[in-house]
Amino acid sequence: MPPLADHDERRATVAEVAADLIEQRGLDAVTFREIADAAGTSTAIVSHYFIDKKDLLRFTYGAAASRARRRLDAQVEAESEVDEKTLVGAVEALLPLDKGSRRDWRVWFAFWGLAVADPDLAAEQRAHVRGARDELAGLIGRLVTLGHLPEDLEVEDSARDLLVVVMGLAAQAVFDPKDWPPPRQRAFIARHIARLSRG
């Protein structure tokens, strides 16, 4: 691992290595020894930046969630006009459509398994899900205000439903990618959002 002056940058680098290990070999591969070996550094360096495995996993999960949020934000900001296509693009930004987003979903699924029995990790998971849901609700609300979606649409319920659809679709796509290639994922989401438009 090259020398890095910035503490946060070093933590992010270690978390990237951890995410790669989770994707390739699962959570059991995430030990300070395995991470140090993969990063070409020592366990002392890894333990300098993370108190324990839980701290490392929480940070790795948070980094994956932040990447998804940045993809969503970038998609919305790239649209010159806010319309139904904006919502489709925002949802697609959350799906496992490429190598990076598939890795992020694998990290999330691994983390969720731990969060079932750990209240701190469960709270972290809830916070990230609520953040994504709130962002989708904000976008859906704008589309209702602009007349692109029915005025009687339940915004909060629609955002909640849409996020559940994303999570279910992502699970199918990550664990059965041949059956759920990116074009099929996109078509599925487009159909779901078209149903929102019809009310």
Model-inferred region functions:
Residues 1-9:
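N-terminal intrinsically disordered/low-complexity leader segments
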Residues 2-3, 102, 120-126, 130, ...:
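Hydrophobic/aromatic-rich alpha-helical bundle segments in the mid-to-C-terminal region
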Residues 13, 17-59:
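Helix-turn-helix
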Residues 13, 17-25, 71-75, 107, ...:
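Solvent-exposed, amphipathic alpha-helical segments
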Residues 59, 70-105, 155-162:
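Hydrophobic alpha-helical connector segments
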Residues 62-68:
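Short, basic, alpha-helical segments at the C-terminal edge of helix-turn-helix-like DNA-binding modules
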Residues 89-138:
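Short secondary-structure transition hinges
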